[in-house]
Amino acid sequence: MFKKKKIYLCLLNQGEIRTDLAKVLNYIQQNDSYEIMVSYPASKPITNNRNMIVQKFLAIKDADYLMMIDSDIIPTPNILNLVDFNKDIITPLMLVQQKGTLIPLYLRRNADGIYDAGNYLEETGLQEVDATGTGCIVIKREVLEKVEHPFENVYDRDGIKKLGNDFNFCQKAKKLGFKVWVHLDYVADHISDCSLREMFLDKIKQYHNDKELHQIKQVLKEKGQLDTILEEVNKLKNKDANK
């Protein structure tokens, strides 16, 4: 008999849940392809909350995957499909905004040990990374059975945080041979002052429009037609300006 995968789904919150997230959660719970247990943990601080969640998950002996969703993240309604990729650690593409810059949590570590955003504008589908966020994450049971103290910040000798619990968790898991994945076709929204998902989609659209325009210019240039067309465009602009 086919055994459904059992998912312990935790919606981390501080006493309230957004309406749009509640709608997605309701849709998720109607998916009968999986056995789903839902919890709403609200302990503080966040590292304590996550580690308590892990212990409760491990106590459920037949649970296969832990999924955690933060209350400011709106995943896609089909987010449970990530379980079927059978990866150690997998997330949708998540985004943060720092000083007005949109940053994808799709990170690879360079030779200097610095995390850089991968080329998410060019790539699609399932991609292996060195680090991702924990705002919406699916973790296989074997990972949490082996990673000790999974969620903890790292501080320097002066007590200043130098590594967040999300990146630290990824580092610990990778040291034990587990792999971290991000699926770029699943884009979660991150609600702050605005929808970061909408900003991301606008950026993707602009990127591909610019790329297509560049390719057209290259073809025209190779055919010796670019200068003539640009000259005609400038004439039209000047004509409109003089009206």
Segment roles from a protein language model:
Residues 1-43, 48:
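N-proximal low-complexity "stem/linker" segments adjacent to membrane-targeting elements
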Residues 30-32, 83, 174:
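Anion (oxyanion) recognition and catalysis
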